From Swiss-Prot:
Organism: Guillardia theta
Superkingdom of source: Eukaryota
Cellular component aspect of the GO annotation: chloroplast
UniProtKB keywords: Chloroplast, Plastid
Protein's UniProt keywords contain Plastid: yes
Protein's cellular compartments: Plastid, Chloroplast
Chief place where the protein resides: plastid
Full protein name: Uncharacterized 30.1 kDa protein
Length: 252
């Protein structure tokens, strides 16, 4: 997968994730409304804060732990819990946005958001596992963690969109995409090695499960309503392998 302008795609992606999270969390304040004014209740800084935490934890683990931590026989649940605990520690250690941003290794962060050509094969292998673990966080919300369900749900709605698609934006190798489905992940099945077939089934395997927990709220005829139309959008636009066009249409 190659994109003409990765930076624009990522910016659209982040903007889209922010809008979706804000719309979703309106349910905590009202089930119906006549204007978009309530969208402003959810702070954008919190989304940036959580994104920085996730990416920083990922790079800390990549630097401090060898590949066999991710690829050996260690149980998937143990890896998942380890990631979750590290995210929690980061949140507790830097309990405000300013402290966190000062602690981030922005060289790594910028590399993560830069050209796909700078992503090494080792990065890709580690990120495949990191992606799986994040998926588990988003779908199962590990009950043994002391991170509140509310915080984790915020991470979930935001990152199920952002992490998945950034991952795909960074990959330009079909075999790497296919290798996702050869792991021991509980979510995916090895038969999904055809890229288009994978996109068609992604709704059923991941997104439908997420949005059954966190319905998407949209404004229709000046009324806030639950709407799952996002799922067919995923098929029709992502199958064209043009994320920029897809996000542009959704953001209009």
């Amino acid at each position: 997968m190659k994109f003409n302008n990765l930076k624009i795609s990522l910016e659209l992606l982040f903007l889209y994730a922010q809008i979706k999270v804000k719309l979703t969390h309106l349910k905590h304040y009202s089930t119906r409304c006549s204007t978009l004014s309530l969208i402003t209740v959810f702070p954008l800084d919190l989304l940036n804060y959580l994104s920085l935490i996730i990416i920083d934890v990922y790079y800390e683990i990549c630097i401090n732990y060898p590949n066999n931590f991710w690829l050996d026989s260690t149980s998937f649940d143990s890896r998942f819990l380890f990631i979750l605990q590290n995210i929690e520690k980061k949140i507790l250690r830097h309990n405000n946005y300013e402290l966190l941003t000062k602690s981030i290794n922005f060289k790594n962060y910028n590399l993560f958001l830069s050209s796909a050509n700078l992503i090494t094969h080792e990065d890709e292998k580690l990120f495949i596992w990191f992606f799986h673990i994040l998926s588990e966080i988003l779908i199962h919300k590990h009950k043994s963690s002391t991170i509140s369900v509310k915080l984790l749900s915020i991470v979930g709605v935001h990152l199920i969109v952002k992490t998945l698609l950034i991952f795909l934006l960074l990959i330009n190798n079909q075999s790497v995409v296919n290798s996702i489905f050869l792991s021991d992940s509980k979510i995916y099945h090895p038969q999904f090695i055809n890229f288009n077939f994978w996109w068609q089934n992604l709704n059923q395997l991941v997104l439908r499960r997420i949005y059954s927990l966190y319905p998407i709220y949209v404004i229709k005829n000046n009324v806030l309503t639950t709407n799952y139309v996002f799922l067919p959008y995923f098929n029709s636009y992502l199958l064209q392998s043009n994320l920029t066009t897809w996000f542009s249409k959704l953001l209009k």
